[in-house]
A protein has these predicted regions:
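Hydrophobic positions on the alpha1 helix immediately C-terminal to the Walker A/P-loop
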Residues: 190, 194
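Flexible, gly/pro- and Lys/Arg-enriched active-site loops
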Residues: 47-53, 67-70, 75-172
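Extreme N-terminal starter segment of soluble prokaryotic enzymes
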Residues: 2-7, 174-176
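P-loop (Walker A) phosphate-binding loop of NTP-binding proteins
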Residues: 182
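Hydrophobic anchor at the beta1->P-loop junction of P-loop NTPases
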Residues: 179
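Conserved substrate/cofactor phosphate-moiety recognition/catalytic segment
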Residues: 195-217
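Short, surface-exposed acidic-centric catalytic microdomains
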Residues: 19-66
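Conserved lysine of the Walker
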Residues: 187
Length: 217
């Protein structure tokens, strides 16, 4: 079984979906690459009264050590305007990023506990987690994520939504997107892929009007 590094994302303030997109983009500004993305799930606030959350889980690849990865998560939260919690208990937040698993490591320190000590009690984590890592074995409880979800005592229902976190809503801001570059580097392939994924019209250049094609081919 491939070991995974898994992060959970949650937001219940402002534009919740955009917050998830933005958090992923900010994470990839660091030496982090996204491997797997779950669907977006909507769930009621857990442990306090507040607006519903959008939640998701992501499997990543990184050479960052656990403590350094935690620092990145905290930096992203701060960049997105998350304020430090006042007092004990849970509260609404623009973005919430938690390190659920770092491969099969068991980490217990004042600042970081991995696996996340409460993930097996929370359906808003287990539902998206089960989607991307159903057979991953919890290194302390020795059950798969699938088994933990099936045996969960949490009665909260996590409702899957149709949003695709792998496809940011770029056409909301740009009615047209132009792809430029050297001949033969894959512009047309990329443009066709975007057109298919976003169900958009592809406007290809005219080969007869491109003076550089003859010299290239």
């Amino acid at each position: 079984m491939e070991e995974q590094i898994i992060i959970s994302l949650g937001s219940n303030l402002g534009d919740r979906l955009n917050a998830l997109y933005k958090a992923l983009a900010l994470l990839e500004a660091y030496p982090i690459s996204i491997k797997l993305l779950s669907k977006v799930y909507e769930t009621p606030a857990w442990g306090f009264k507040g607006e519903p959350f959008y939640n998701a889980c992501v499997s990543i690849k990184t050479k960052l050590k656990p403590k350094d990865l935690l620092e990145v998560l905290l930096k992203v939260e701060k960049t997105m305007g998350r304020l430090p919690s006042k007092g004990k208990g849970y509260s609404s937040r623009t973005i919430d990023l938690d390190l659920l698993f770092y491969k099969s490591k068991n980490i217990f320190s004042a600042k970081l506990k991995v696996p996340h000590p409460k993930l097996h009690k929370r359906n808003f984590v287990l539902a998206p987690l089960c989607e991307i890592a159903p057979k991953f074995i919890h290194p302390i409880l020795f059950q798969t994520i699938e088994e933990l979800f099936q045996n969960s005592s949490d009665r909260i229902i996590a409702t899957p939504l149709t949003y695709d976190l792998g496809l940011p809503p770029i056409f909301k801001s740009f009615p047209y997107i132009v792809i430029e570059g050297n001949i033969g580097v894959g512009k047309t392939t990329l443009a066709k892929l975007l057109a298919v994924n976003y169900n958009s019209k592809l406007l290809s250049e005219s080969f007869t009007k491109n003076p550089f094609l003859e010299a290239f081919y």
